[in-house]
Amino acid sequence: MSSPAPAPMPSVVPGQRLMHPQAANDLLMYRLNRLLAVAGSLVVRLCEGGYGITRREWGLVMMLAQHPGMPPAELARRLGLDRSRTSRAVTSLLSKKLISRESMPGDRRQAVLSLTPTGLAVHDALLPQVKALNQELLAGLAPDAVQALDIALHHMQQRAESLVSTRTDVPRTYRLRGGRHHDAA
């Protein structure tokens, strides 16, 4: 006795999945996350296997190559990371001697971060490899599709930032307290 065949999924016209999602893998955030997981795994392998740094640490290295002498809080803001994760990555990069920390004159609590010569060498060796992976990924698209994607990503980033700042109806996270916020009764 054979089991009945599963009911066919309602078909969605290609190019319409985002506007009319039928399943989790039709949702924009899910699809972007999967793309990052798959394509990003190559960057992780390059970073960790080739240079002994995490992808997050690579983000800090790239930012400090572009903006040397940046305070950790500004680095966190520009990378969209929380301060604790940034602090852990900074501590790791300091121990690997890829970045240096210099106290500000007049206020030793304030500091700026810069790449060391070793950190700059890692950046200069790794960046062309990451750019090549980026180009390989984009090679699957026509030039006009790449341009449209670039424009769409720019607009979506602006929209997401606007939503985060204006959507006060969405509950805040309280991860340090174990999840959802519960008002004291």
Give residue spans per PLM region.
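Charged, amphipathic alpha-helical coiled-coil/dimerization segments
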Residues: S2-P6, P10-S11, G15, T91-H154, ...
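N-terminal helix-turn-helix DNA-binding core of bacterial DNA-binding proteins
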Residues: Y30, S41-R85, V90, K96, ...
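Exposed, interaction-prone assembly regions rather than primary DNA-binding/catalytic cores
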Residues: Q147-A185
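N-terminal leader segment of winged-helix/HTH proteins
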Residues: M1-Y51, R177-A185
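Short, locally clustered residues in the helix-turn-helix/winged-helix DNA-binding domain
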Residues: L36, M62-Q66, L127
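Short, polar/charged, Gly/Pro-enriched helix-capping and turn/loop motifs at alpha-helix termini
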Residues: L42, L46, L133, L137-G140, ...
